[in-house]
A protein has these predicted regions:
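Cap/insert and terminal regions of metallo-dependent hydrolase folds
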Residues: 67-155
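Binuclear metal-dependent hydrolase catalytic cores
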Residues: 1-59, 65-70, 75-76, 133-161
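Structural beta-sheet core signal
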Residues: 59-60, 124
Length: 161
């Protein structure tokens, strides 16, 4: 995992050695937290996480390509009713057709998913590199027409649950 092409710095050169463990779908043992993982649709695999908080549940679902019911339906069940969801909105609807199979979604799919699954707050992230703040503001505005409580995640965004 800590080697090319997945990571730019070899493990032996890291100043601090992080503990790494494989996580499987299902209950995840994180002391002090109630965490569940679910497989997502992405080449090479990816997991979504649902973390139960005192004031609601947080779902983090990066690297997911909508369009395969065998992944989309379990994700809907997994995320339904969450207070907050963070979803991969890498592409615009216009860009997505040229990138089928890449394992990413567009902002419209994310807004429709959040609206149809009773999710209180949607945060779009995994923005395409080079997309300007102005373009992201336009995406946010468009997505809010489908799911009012939508925002675009940015560096240092914090969410309390």
């Amino acid at each position: 995992m800590f080697k090319s092409p997945f990571f730019p710095v070899p493990y032996e050169h890291l100043p601090n050695k992080p503990k790494v463990r494989m996580v499987e779908p299902g209950k995840v043992d994180v002391p002090g937290f109630d965490v569940t993982a679910l497989n997502l649709h992405h080449p090479g695999g990816s997991l979504a996480y649902r973390i139960k908080g005192a004031n609601g549940d947080f779902v983090y679902a990066t690297d997911h390509e909508f369009g395969d019911p065998s992944f989309d339906e379990p994700l809907a069940e997994f995320a339904r009713g969450a207070s907050v969801i963070v979803l991969d909105a890498h592409f615009t609807p216009e860009e997505l057709p040229q990138h089928k199979g890449w394992g990413h979604s567009d902002w419209r799919q994310c807004a429709e998913f959040a609206a149809s699954n009773d999710i209180a707050s949607l945060w779009l992230f995994h923005h395409k590199p080079g997309r300007s703040d102005q373009a992201l503001a336009g995406i946010r505005e468009q997505a809010q027409k489908t799911h009012r409580a939508t925002d675009t995640a940015s560096e240092e965004t914090t969410i309390d649950i």
